[in-house]
Amino acid sequence: MRGILKVAAVCALMLGAVGAWAQDSGEAVYKLKCAMCHGADGTANTPAGKAFNAASYKDPAVMKTPDADLIAVVKNGKNKMPAFGTMLTDAQIKAVVAYVHTLQK
């Protein structure tokens, strides 16, 4: 329980970390907002990813999800994933979803 609280606290600190240089770069936003749970390579093989059962972007079933649905999950959250709709612009969210597709390869 204590470990999950530490992970949640670190995630909360990182939520405010997107710099101006990363505003429209899907890769940069992913690295700052998503990689902690989903991993730099998209496998979700991280302590936070395991704790929160994060989706792996190497899973073909996950990647068959329509972009509109992925965008909705990023904006509104789902299960243990927090909502980022108030922290990221629509352009940033779309850029992250586009970047996630590059991790599938």
Predicted region positions:
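Bacterial N-terminal signal peptides that target proteins for export
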Residues: 1-9
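Low-complexity, intrinsically disordered/propeptide-like segments
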Residues: 8, 16-18, 73
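Electrostatic cytochrome c docking/interface patches
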Residues: 13-29, 45
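Periplasmic/extracellular electron-transfer cofactor-ligation site
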Residues: 27-53, 78-80, 102-105
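Extracytoplasmic electron-transfer domains, predominantly the class I c-type cytochrome c fold
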Residues: 51-104
